[in-house]
């Protein structure tokens, strides 16, 4: 069992994505992905607001965190541009926070509910393990090089999922 006071929830955000540049502040459903994540988190019934940290470098992202009263860890420019080759650069905050444990939330998941986030946070707090990973069951279909379906088709389905 871990003390909730020892666990922070970090949202790492940046504007330099190569696949979708500026996706954290791009218009999405009359708001932004980062705004959605911040609004959700401040509504948590489990995670204390003082345990929520936005790790960001760019002023536009920092402004969003501050708008919601979220603590901001100011990432280095190098960290915000990193593509994950060196994890110590990408996660430059990992040894600079005053918490024993970190739950990392990807803000690119606008449909992830606060109830699921709270449930995961509690599951981690109540586990004796140092790490925990969120996974979902998903049915995937695979074909061989000749184009033949090699995954067993689910009986009764006319279309995929």
What is the meaning of each model-derived region?
Residues 43-46, 53, 59-103, 111-115, ...:
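Short phosphate-binding loop-to-helix
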Residues 20-43:
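Short, well-formed alpha-helical segments that are part of the catalytic scaffolds
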Residues 6-11, 34, 41, 51-54:
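Hydrophobic targeting segments
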Residues 14, 77, 106, 136-137:
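Histidine-centered beta-alpha loop that forms part of the nucleotide-sugar donor binding/catalytic region
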Residues 1-21:
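N-terminal nucleotide-binding beta1-loop-alpha1 segment
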Residues 3-4, 94-100, 125-127:
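Glycine-rich phosphate-binding loop signature in dinucleotide/nucleotide-binding domains
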Residues 83, 89, 110-161:
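Conserved core of the sugar-phosphate nucleotidyltransferase
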